């Protein structure tokens, strides 16, 4: 199985810092970050540190949703760990690796709103820009492509998640 580079480690780092600057200048700042596990954890770690460098220090609460299991075809979304009562009245920044059809992000936003968040914004490392997506991201590091992506937290049946770049399997 060969891999093709889409975005290098250096390109990702520069883009994450630029995205943090954009978020830090927004009129409504988040006060809590909520990464979607497992795919969003690496991007989330980089983004919250970049935000701290911009003077935006966020509390962190994890949300663990699963939609792919061990295959490439999305299945029903299951919640492993949901939002806590600590997000009630808070401005939440949901962070995920990829926005494909948007089902996972849509579920996350619904759960967070139901838990009483004052506002919910979404940041993703890669937005595939699908016209049929059921969710939208407020902040996007990279756009486009319909490839099945790997690396930087995103996997193929549990493999390739720890790669320091975003690539695709060819």
Where are these regions (language model features)?
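PRPP-associated nucleotide enzymes
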Residues: 1-170
């Amino acid at each position: 199985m060969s891999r093709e580079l889409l975005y290098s480690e250096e390109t990702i780092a520069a883009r994450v810092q630029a995205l943090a600057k954009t978020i830090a200048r927004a009129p409504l700042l988040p006060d809590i970050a909520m990464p979607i596990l497992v795919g969003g954890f690496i991007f989330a770690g980089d983004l919250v540190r970049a935000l701290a460098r911009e003077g935006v220090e966020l509390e962190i609460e994890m949300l663990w949703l699963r939609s792919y299991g061990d295959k490439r075809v999305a299945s029903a979304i299951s919640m492993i760990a949901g939002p806590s009562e600590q997000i009630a009245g808070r401005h939440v920044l949901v962070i995920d690796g990829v926005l494909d059809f948007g089902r996972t992000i849509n579920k996350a936003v619904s759960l967070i709103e139901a838990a009483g968040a004052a506002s919910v914004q979404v940041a993703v490392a890669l937005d595939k820009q699908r016209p049929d997506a059921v969710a939208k991201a407020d902040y996007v590091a990279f756009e486009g492509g319909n490839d099945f992506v790997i690396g930087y937290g995103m996997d193929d049946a549990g493999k390739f998640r720890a790669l320091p770049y975003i690539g695709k399997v060819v």
